[in-house]
Design a protein with these regions (language model features):
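Terminal domain-initiation and capping elements
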Residues: 1-5
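Conserved beta-strand/loop scaffold segments within soluble protein domains that form the structured core
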Residues: 6-178
Length: 178
C-alpha cells in the first residue's frame, strides 16, 4: 500500500473543496482523503486526477465536465472508506473513471449524461479477503439523445469476504440513439 502513496507523492496536489481545471494539464494531480471535493473541468479542458482513500471516512466527490472537457479520474481505496461520486457531463465531454478497491470499501457512483455526444467509461475492480466486504453501486442516467456509456466491474473475494455490484442504466424517454 505504501508503494501507491510513494508513486503519487510526486504528483501535484489537488487541494480545497473546489478544484478547477482550465486548459490542458501536463501531468496528473492527486487528492488524498478528500472529505468533500468538487472537480470542475472548463469547456475544452483536460486533466487527470488520482483520488486515494487511506482513512476509514465518508467522502463526497462531485465531478462536472463542461462541453468538450476530457477527464481521467482514478480512485484507489486503501482503507474502509464510504464514497459517493456524482458525475455531470455536458455535450461532447468524456470522463474515464477507474475504481480500485483493495480493502473493504463502499463506492456509489451516479453519472448524469446531460449533453449530446457525452461519453462515460467506468472500469472497476475489487479484491477482498478475510472478512472484507466491497460494494460498488452504479447508476448511469442517459438524459439526452446520442450519449454513450460503458461500465465494467470485476471482483475477487476469497475466504469469507464478500463483493457486491448493483448497476442501473436509465434512458430518458426522449434520449434516443444512446
Amino acid at each position: 500500500m505504501t508503494a501507491i502513496l510513494d508513486i503519487i507523492r510526486d504528483f501535484r496536489t489537488a487541494q480545497g473543496e473546489v478544484f478547477r481545471i482550465e486548459g490542458t494539464q501536463d501531468g496528473p494531480y492527486a487528492a488524498v482523503d478528500p472529505r468533500h471535493m468538487r472537480i470542475e473541468a472548463a469547456a475544452g479542458a483536460s486533466g487527470r486526477i488520482v483520488v486515494v482513500h487511506t482513512a476509514p471516512d465518508m467522502s463526497s466527490l462531485e465531478i462536472v465536465a463542461a462541453e468538450d472537457a476530457r477527464l481521467e479520474i482514478t480512485e484507489v481505496f486503501l482503507a474502509e472508506a464510504f464514497a459517493e461520486i456524482a458525475v455531470k457531463q455536458s455535450a461532447r465531454s468524456l470522463c474515464r473513471l477507474t475504481a480500485v478497491q483493495l480493502t473493504s470499501a463502499n463506492a456509489s457512483y451516479t453519472i448524469d449524461l446531460d449533453g449530446r455526444d457525452a461519453e462515460n467509461m467506468l472500469g472497476g475492480v475489487f479484491l477482498a479477503g478475510g472478512e472484507e466486504h466491497c460494494v460498488v453501486k452504479l447508476r448511469t442516467n442517459h438524459n439526452v439523445p446520442d450519449c454513450r456509456s460503458n461500465s465494467y466491474i470485476k471482483g475477487v473475494a476469497g475466504g469469507s469476504a464478500r463483493g457486491e455490484f448493483c448497476g442501473l442504466v436509465y434512458v430518458a424517454p426522449d434520449a434516443q440513439h444512446t
